[in-house]
Amino acid sequence: MKLLRGIFKAVISLALLLVMLTAGVYIFVRAKYGIDLWNTVGQLKAISKSVDESEVCPDAFVAGDYTSMQTVVNASVDGLVGGDEEAGFTISFDTLPSEMTSIISLTDKQVGALADVVIKKYVNSKITIAGKDIAIVLKQIKFDTDENGVTAFNTVVRLDMTPFKQEMNKFPLKYLKKYVPQYMYVSSTVNVTKGTTAFSYHIEHNALAINKLSADKTEDLFKTLDKVLKIGDAETLNKKIGNIVIGSLVGSESQTGLAYSLKPIGATDYAFTKVGGVNNFVINK
């Protein structure tokens, strides 16, 4: 009987010690880093669950959208988009025909296919976050233009988080590392407003969501991670994704994009249009 009581007391003491140590770690991390460990672990657990792509990007562009995009673009600019579904698609603005023969009008899925081809060629499918080059894969693009001409532009991308996980070996990140998935699906929505001059635009933050987290919880998680990883807030990443994708479509002197690159052969501007409930990205001549 005395032996059982001794074992019971030892177990209780050990349990209390573990509780005190855990509470101590929580209080220390909260005080030193401003991180709520329990809340952060809960959020990371939510995004660490396996992701069904059909749920996070139900309207993803597919192989046929590359082919139809190629047909539309090449009907105006002969030979601009090369390749096929088997070999993959390519694009180059180095050698252009003498003239853009007609306007180019693309649906959201065709826009997704075009942006993917341009980003692979001219951005090397990378996005820089906290000084690290992160592999980015476009999965879905949808946009809608309101009566005021503001376009809510949504992009779903997959980010490879390996470079960050490799550096999460020190306290307190080592406690969070196992909950960070290798891939994060990021839904980026920005508001795009056309500028007053040709080929110009302005991008504003709308919403950012990771995997199945809400936009609010995503912003809260980014605030936490920024304190130790210095990755910036959700708005910063959102605008970065938006600028890469919109830049691949419109372009400028500093970023290679379709519309601006066709200026020497007759392109006059771009537009996001909505006619009969159908949204299109248009390059005018």
Describe the predicted segments one by one.
Residues 2-285:
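Extracellular/lumenal and peripheral-membrane lipid-interaction modules
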